[in-house]
Amino acid sequence: MTVFSKKMTATIPAMLLCALLSGATTMSYADTTNPNAPVSLIEQWDKTFPESAKVDHRKVTFQNRYGITLVGDLYLPKDRGERKLAAIAVSGPFGAVKEQSSGLYAQTLAEQGFVTLAFDPSYTGESGGYPRNVASPDINTEDFSAAVDFLGLQKEVDRNRIGLLGICGWGGMALNDAAMDTRVKAVATSVMYDMSRAMGHGVGDGKDRYTTADRRAVLQYLNAQRWKDAANGTFAPGGHDIYVDDKGNVSAAARILPETLPANPNPVLKEFFDYYRMPRGFHARSVNSTGAWNATMPLSFMNMPLLSYASEVTIPTLIVTGEQAHSRYFAEDAFKAIGSKEKALVIVPGANHVDLYDNAAGKIPFATFAQFFKTNLK
């Protein structure tokens, strides 16, 4: 249902008449009076990691520039006193929720003296936005700036000492925002993806996977799905890692991860499955754990490169990745493109991509992240 202002109601009959006379039909995807409102605000602790006794936790909401209400977890060190502290906005991985990796990073850094905010991106988790399970290079970059807005208004925060930390696909978003938002004073990524490159060119073995013909085939596949969605008045779910075989045939899985792991799985699939689908990292609100994105979601990423202005990231930058991470090439290429003279690339020995999600293997270099932000948010 669409809600119109009083001013608009006078024009509705004329609009409907025009539609009838022209033989026009309308598409209606939503039936909600406030699609930008939070989906939920769960107060009890429902994270995939234990609550720290050293940190105060608050459930918070804030709006981005598009009017979507985001839901976050604010973490504050218990021993903060009355002084204003540096703050860090944290999000990711791509398709995860704040109760997973980003919350763990945020809480751990709060133990080190920072005010931190882990938040659900627009259209996912508890945050508002319709249709559900959509990502956008523009709106999700804005989500980081909205988090900066929120942090800068908190009485515990020194607004001149705010940084960003993006995990997995949110690493690219963090770098994109750091190039745009001059209020951000330091930026870090962990096992970053450039999602525009991943979806626009395919994730290969240390390099892009799609040929020019493959890209065209993927675009045709996605736009054919648009016709189906338009005809059905709904948004079909579908995987965002789209495959093109040697004959140009295009396919995508119905889910991000299978319900059960197949025999002899791809090692990267097993990494993700062992986190998102198992008790270790499963969360009911995580699209990676339970389902799929909107099938046409990759369209905006195909032609909107996130790191076009990486050379304009001139603030201190920390890029962390795993020695064995399949995503390592994203981090190394981003590091080369970053314009800052104060940048560091840290490759964690023996770590794969998901090792840096939850520290089950003890490989997340939290001390490195903490020292980076202490040095550059002072």
Go through each PLM region and give its residues:
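Catalytic active-site module of serine/aspartate enzymes centered on a nucleophile-bearing elbow/loop
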Residues: 349-351, 359-378
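Conserved alpha/beta-hydrolase
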Residues: 108-128
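N-terminal cap/lid segment of alpha/beta-hydrolase-fold proteins
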Residues: 37-83
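Alpha/beta-hydrolase-fold enzymes
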Residues: 176-272
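Short beta-strand/loop motif that positions the catalytic acidic residue
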Residues: 313, 319-321
